[in-house]
Structure formats: structure tokens, C-alpha cells
């Protein structure tokens, strides 16, 4: 199975991220908890609303479009709930089972010793952005990662895309150790993009400048999973469900995931493919080419299906009832 997936997906990089489903006016939903509302929160202010956590793991297709391999809506109010980490571990185990060995790209929210230890246990590679609180073992003592960051300057110049804009960045790296097990890793530093240089921890081997650049590119391609969440919420009205049971909510999420997978399938088709050409014609996009085509594909499919007033029942052959004529068996 993993061999077949390797043929479809561009690189065996798995992106894990958390999102939220907010139901501020909900009262009857099962196990409704409090979540951080990402649309209202800022760097200086955190807003909490009633809702659910969503943990998603995605991979990229050959044309750089995300496909989900794990998606779960969960809440700390559930009876058998243990921790958010356990849900994340399930996503990691799913990725390891599908691909054998992959690279996990994760944001600062996953800078946790438990995450590093779990990935080491599964024998997986990772690229995880570190927080300012992280301490690393360097030259026989524990030092703040920010201290190592401030002592260095980027020597490797490259162009990186961040939040839709291209930036000239400088990269540097240093060999350090992490967690109580003191595993050897590399700290990759990215200067020139954010106010404070980014700190990326990776256990991937670095033998050349190209390896350093590839590690940075792996992390910065994370924006596609964030766009995946936005597309789910906008095109499928993800937060507008009415079912109350958590199992039913996850069932709806599963069907949306299938729809998103179909969009990924169509995005890989040639521009001359008859169905894709019809979808694009109906979508009537303003821009000829975009990096993320799910929106226009979903719009085109929605436009085509808007003509289907009778549903799908007319596509099936009608079963005619058997003749109800009275039959008499004649005997000689």
C-alpha cells in the first residue's frame, strides 16, 4: 500500500496541524468544549469560544495539493478523552503505517519533548519549529535556543515563500542535542523573513547547503495545510453542521474529506481532460493559473451539480413492478 502511495504523492512529507470548529451559539452539541478561535485571536490576544478541536494530517500530491490521511474532531469533554497528544500520536502512527518512513513537518505548537520522543520511537524524520522557551544541549551544557540563534548569522542565501510572498532569506545550521535522551539533531536558523529568526529542529542528515535549503522548504510548504483548512470551512461550510452527536459530526467530516480527496484527484488531471475542462469552464476563473486550485474546482463542480434538480435517482434504471394480472393455471 505504501508503494502505491509513493507513486501518487510528491514527497513523503506529512504535515500535522490543529484547527478548530467554533459553535458559539451551540448548547445541545455533544461534549462541546472551549477552543481557541483562530479567526479572532491575535498574537497579543487569545479568544476562546465553544467548539471542537480538529487534528489533521496531510500529504502533498505530485502537483503540490494536500490530501488528508488523518482527520478527527475531538473534545476534552469526551468521557474517554485522555489528551490532545494521544490524538496527535494516532495521526503519527497512521502516517508511519502508510509510508514506512516519512518526514513530519509541524509548527511551534508541537515543540514538546513527548513529540520528539514519539517520532524517535516510530523512527521517523521531522522538521519542527521551536518556541523561544526551548533549551538545547550544546558543548556540554543546556543553553536557550534563542542564544544560539542570536550568536549566528545566515550564510546560505535562498528565496522562500512565506504567507504568499517571496522573501530573500539567509540560513544557518548548528549541531545540537535535544530532550533528556540527548539525541543529535540540527538547529536550522532562518533569517530575514520574520521579526525574530525562525528556529527549526530536524533529525534529518545535513551534508550540504542544498540539504539545509530543503529542510527550510519542507517547513515553509506547511501553508498548504492551512489553506486546506480554509477551503474546508469556506467551500463546504464546515462549521455550519446541525447534527449534535460527535460520531455524526465526524461522519460529516469524513464525507468532506472524501470530497477534498476528489478535488485533489481532479487537480492531477491534464488540462485537456474532458471532465476537468468542463469544471474549469463552469468555474470561469479570473486568473488563468493559481498555486491552489481547490476553490475553482469546487466552484465548477457546484455549478454543474446545480442543474441536477432530481438528485441521482434518474441515473438508475427504474425497477418496474411485476405484472399484477390474474394468471390461471390450466390443466388438461
Predicted regions span which residues?
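Short amphipathic alpha-helical "interface-anchor" segments enriched in bulky aromatics
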Residues: 214-242
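Electropositive, glycine- and tryptophan-enriched low-complexity nucleic-acid-binding patches
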Residues: 38-101, 185-199, 203
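Charge-biased C-terminal accessory regions appended to nucleic-acid-, cytoskeletal NTPase
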Residues: 291-332
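Short, conserved catalytic/metal-binding motifs centered on acidic residues
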Residues: 13-21, 57, 103-111, 126, ...
